[in-house]
Amino acid sequence: FAGGAFRFVNVSGALQSAIAKVVKKYSNTIWVLIPLLTSIFTLICTVKGVNTFIPFAPILVVIAQAMGLDAIVGVGIILLGGAVGFSTGPLNGSTTTVAQELAGLPLYSGIGYRMVCLVVFAVVTNIYLVRYAMKIKKNPELSPMYGYTAGTQKSEEKSLDDFGPMTKTKSLILIIMAACLLVMVGGSLTFGWGMMDMAAIYIWMAVLMAITLRMSPNQAVNEFIAGMKTMLMAASIVCVAKAVSSILTAGTIIDTIIYGLSFILKAVPTILQGPAMYMINIVINIFITSGSGQAAVVIPIVAPLADMIGITRQTAVLAFNCGDGFCNYILPTSSALMGILSMGNVPYDRWMKFMWKLFLIWMVVGSVLMIIAQMIHFGPM
């Protein structure tokens, strides 16, 4: 139902107009504009996947080039901003809530420390991107994209005016979205709402947006179904992954895996067990790029494993979030990464010339945050 609800946000053009308004206001101050734009994608991707914004890539590239920057900055605003929101996962329904439910944790629990992680990663990521942008603005030859002109016509087909003004209707759409998300978080933390309750809120969100957009019942239903179709693959992967998990459990294979991993993690110094679990999830993500699929396969294993070695289950879920999320922005098998790079006309090899240092920084920052989570006994067991 989340896909169906957010379909109305996309159809309304509210996010597109909001971005265009911000760009027009701060276009002469790169150090302000870039963090503002990445923050938009960070906040939205706390609840949605980055692949939602594949169509945004051409316009962000145009914006970057208009400011004397390169296409990497344009796609980086989407990818890096979205990476922080998705990977820390304070409100993510396809990863965090799935993992917490499998781990036996209250939905959206631990949101306070997750928001701290989000802010830390956001600051580090924006510093990296702004420094890069200012460097290549001063000396364009330092850009990995220097001299690459293939496919630039595709990016120039759109402009800011294509998104239209920020109307009262579009503002109402964004208010409805924010209000529904706040209700979901509040209900989960206060009343212990589960996945069925979340689904009901998404339905109400869709209904209110359809009324705001003055859609006919038939049109609203068609749009809702079209949005749900985008989530079918993720839902199918979760079902298959849960089936695999059930087979592993029934055959007592999962017990053997947990026992073996416990020996590995026990050999690691106690203070580094959280980072070790983070690294394990990074490796697993190479083979299972779906966040919900990885949650369904990994959490039934790492949750009892965390109990064995004395790490809270909340820390194990956070290690899964970060390990699954950040790795997606270097893997050529990631649909979100390759889709946005393709739309922005940025070759994968040139993206990696820019990205590899930031990924190493993410690994270090993530490891430090895992150590802190372990030290404070993060969240309920």
Regions found by a protein language model. Give the residues of each.
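Hydrophobic alpha-helical transmembrane segments of multi-pass integral membrane proteins
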Residues: 28-59, 239-243, 248, 264-304, ...
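Transmembrane alpha-helical segments and their short flanking loops
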Residues: 89-116, 308-315, 335-381
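Transmembrane-helix bundle segments that line or gate the permeation/cavity pathway
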Residues: 49, 55, 70-102, 113-152
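Core transmembrane alpha-helical segments of multi-pass membrane transporters/permeases
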Residues: 1-16, 193-256
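Re-entrant/interfacial helical elements at transmembrane boundaries that shape
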Residues: 19-20, 52-63, 93-103, 292-305, ...
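Hydrophobic core segments of alpha-helical transmembrane domains in multi-pass membrane transport
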Residues: 1-7, 40-42, 85, 116-130, ...
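Alpha-helical transmembrane segments of multi-pass membrane proteins
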Residues: 30-45, 69-87, 110, 119, ...
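Long, contiguous bundles of hydrophobic transmembrane helices that form the permeation core
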Residues: 111-223, 353, 375-381
